From Swiss-Prot:
GO molecular-function terms, A-Z: phospholipase D activity; RNA endonuclease activity, producing 5'-phosphomonoesters
Provenance organism: Rickettsia felis (strain ATCC VR-1525 / URRWXCal2) (Rickettsia azadi)
Chief localisation class: secreted
Name of the molecule in the record: Phospholipase D
EC number: 3.1.4.4
Higher taxonomy: Bacteria, Pseudomonadati, Pseudomonadota, Alphaproteobacteria, Rickettsiales
Alphabetical keyword list: Hydrolase, Lipid degradation, Lipid metabolism, Secreted, Signal, Virulence
């Protein structure tokens, strides 16, 4: 009986090792990514609560597509920046927003951008154009996708929503943009930006 149990254990170990080696052979990064994902999942999310009555005293603006026009709405906000712009973006291919960011950099505004890694290969991404303009552009190497769509202006204004910074978001998709002018909220978003930057 003991010999049979030992044989069963040996077969089980061999089977598990076989599966593990098979997975590793097809995708050497599988276990590294799995560990990274588990470590991300195990760390508690940073949840911050806001008193709605306080936020209601903030200036809030919205924009929806269709019809087109949210790109110009966002670019106008960038044009008003005086000190700093921190951006997180999944898609970054819109010419008008790119021009507004470059112009901001040229007039002395500190512009810092974090993009999803897909921009390294996307044909229409403005990544290299932004870098040529001497803008600090980093890649967020989160195991999944960096799906944020956030712009923090002068540490007091947050632009966010479903809107990717692409022509498709403005002209083809149904999207939303919200702008909230609130220093405490902006600092919370900025801290997340800095945390993502530090982790890369």
């Amino acid at each position: 009986m003991k010999r049979k149990n030992n044989k069963f254990i040996e077969i089980s170990i061999a089977f598990i090792l076989g599966v593990a080696l098979g997975i590793y052979g097809q995708n050497p990064d599988y276990f590294t990514n799995l560990i990274n994902q588990k470590s991300l999942a195990s760390s508690a999310p940073k949840i911050k609560h806001y008193n709605i009555s306080e936020l209601l005293r903030s200036k809030v603006s919205t924009c929806f597509t269709p019809p087109a026009g949210c790109t110009k709405f966002i670019a106008n906000q960038i044009d008003r920046a005086e000190e700093s712009i921190y951006m997180q973006a999944y898609g970054m291919s819109d010419a008008l927003i790119t021009t507004a960011l470059i112009n901001a950099q040229m007039r002395g505004v500190k512009v810092r951008i974090l993009l999803d890694r897909s921009n390294l290969k996307q044909k229409f991404s403005k990544l290299h154009e932004l870098q040529r303009a001497k803008i600090d552009v980093g890649i967020d190497k989160v195991p999944g996708i960096a799906h944020n769509k956030v712009i923090i202006i002068d540490r007091k204004k947050v632009i966010t929503g479903s809107f990717n910074f692409t022509a498709a978001a403005d002209k083809r998709n149904a999207e939303n943009v919200i702008i909230i002018e609130d220093r405490e909220l902006a600092e919370s978003y900025l801290q997340n930006w800095l945390n993502r930057k530090a982790s890369n």
